[in-house]
Amino acid sequence: MARIGILKVRGAMPHYEELPFNIYVDESGMIRDLDALIIPPGTLVESKVLERYGWLGREVWDFVERGGTVVGVCSGVQFLSKSINLNVRGLPGYVEGLGVLNISLEPLIVTGPVLVKVINESWATRGLVNTELGGWQAHTYGKINVLNNDVQIDGVSTITRYNYRNATLETPTLVSSRKYRVFGTMVHGILGPNSPISKNLFNELGIHDERIIREYYKLSDERAWAPREDAPRIPRIITVASTMTGEGKTLLTSALVHCLSREGYYVGVAKLGGDIRDLHPSLYVLKRPFKPWMSIMLRWDDKALGWVGWREALSNAAGLGLDYLVVEGVMGLLTGSSRDSEDVFSSTIGFMKQVGTDVILIASAAYDGVEGAIFRLRSYIKELIEIGRKPIIAVLNNMYHGTHEDEEVVRFRRELEGLSILLMTIDALPISSKPEELIDLGDYEEAAVKISEESLCEHLIGSLGQS
């Protein structure tokens, strides 16, 4: 049986989507014996895998130069590229990729479904010119620049929303090497068992039997979202909200799913709005794939931000028999609430009014100090109580300590105890990653596990039992 390996190192997400493989590559000496290698999505560049694993670059190059077949997906394309500009907000900050594909990547934020049109033929796109394939993109650094004739553009995506604005853009998303047997896609979801590109890959390996092809997805299937025997059942929903954007919702969500999963619960995760990058840390922790129902639609005037309506999302969660669905809010609790109506919602608080949900509210002391964070928590808790959504836990993130600050926290804790709300504090962690930029998923997982195991899990299970 042909050996198709998939890279499984820090920052790699081999289970993010259906991909064909039957071997995990996680140590030196494994690549040379493969027939094909998949470089999966994730945060391979941000996780500095070429530096962390000294053998990796050398062994991939040796494999490529011996005629090995390589497929890179999203972060895998960045890994194979010549350079990546990781600075999305200021001056260029280029880091080197492996250089197998003579391309560079620049910041381009895309987080939604796309159609990619095949425009040129390579071994991967043979027989597909002028056809369209449906998938999705979820990246921060996705603008491909071809640097010389060694690389061919095989496909172009038509994007209707990018860089947080609604506008149309056509951009290269499928590329192949004219020099090596290397193909890259920035589009997810086009390498499943029924994909014509996958069939071309299997043809290259001399595999034509559909039953054998299905065998290469067994490891992927092991982490699929499968319905439980007692499904459908209504999951308990926990919504993670913050007083402002950037206060730690994504990290807290990751810690929650780690805790609940560790306790033996079947737990899913979803995001209000369309920025599905915020789901990646939780999916990395769970080692499960992204699905469209995880992006819950908000209405913004006549535009939809997100993929599916909340009823469809919850129906999918119930159909799986999930015990818990953890939903990360969008920006601050009240952001967009002036657009809410009885029929549709544009905000986190609007979602809470529509859906029966437990609430965990977080505020960060990094912006205006412990005092400011407590003031915001107090104000927003009052607002939530008024709509019948009293938080089960309030989280003071990025806590720092001083005599007066600690006394203020003690007073606030007593105040919340009178409301049967638990106050949890999280000291500032040495983590530089951000969900939308420069995120090392391994770094995020370590921080989430630390929060979960040191304090959150014990408090969470107790609070859920009381509410």
What kind of feature is each model-predicted range?
Residues I4-K8, G134-H139, V182-V187:
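Active-site-proximal beta-strand elements of phosphoester/diester hydrolases
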Residues L322-D340:
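Switch II (G3) loop of P-loop NTPases
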Residues T69-G76, L80, E328:
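Ordered, amphipathic secondary-structure segments that act as subunit-interaction surfaces
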Residues R161-G206:
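A glycine-centered loop/beta-turn motif at secondary-structure junctions
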Residues V88-V175:
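Pocket-forming structural segment of enzyme catalytic cores
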Residues S75, S81-G93, G336:
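Glycine/small-residue-rich loop that forms an oxyanion/phosphate-binding "nest" at active or ligand-binding sites
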Residues M1-E65, S75, N85, E106, ...:
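N-terminal beta1-alpha1 cap of cysteine-dependent amidohydrolase-like domains
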